Amino acid sequence: MSSIYDRTDIYDLLEDQTHWSAYKKHWKTLLQGKNVHSFLDVSIGSGSVTLPLCELGVQLAGSDLSEEMIRKCKEKAAAAGYEIELKSCDFRKLSCWEGKQFDCVASTGNSLPHVNNDDVLTALEQMNSLVKKGGYL
């Protein structure tokens, strides 16, 4: 079943340079004084929220349930000249990132409200398993 989250042709219609700048400012403020060099977004979507991290020197990685969103994110990253690792997987089962650890792991956007409370706990446990010691969830 298709959803808005697979409609990459319309998903980013409201995104523009103003939003990009706002996200970049947000991340700069949020991460100021933090030792965050690697960041995993487990619901990266088209990348609009977290791609600006690349401009701040953060090594970004991302995953998403929607392969269409991963494709769109790859296109946007390539167009901006960013090399990021992207994988298609569900944030409730992050085995696609097995063996990797990140300074910060997050689920950006509006993904967590789409699953029940037990699944939120599962997702948070999965995410926490990928956070480096002293890192951020």
Language-model region placement:
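A short SAM/SAH-binding and catalytic strip from SAM-dependent methyltransferases
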Residues: 103-118
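A short glycine-rich, Lys/Arg-flanked "PGG" loop and its adjoining helix->strand segment in the class I
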Residues: 121-133
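Conserved class I S-adenosyl-L-methionine
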Residues: 1-34, 36-45
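Class I SAM-dependent methyltransferase SAM/SAH-binding core
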Residues: 50-93
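A short acidic, Gly/Pro-enriched loop at the edge of an enzyme's catalytic core
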Residues: 96-104
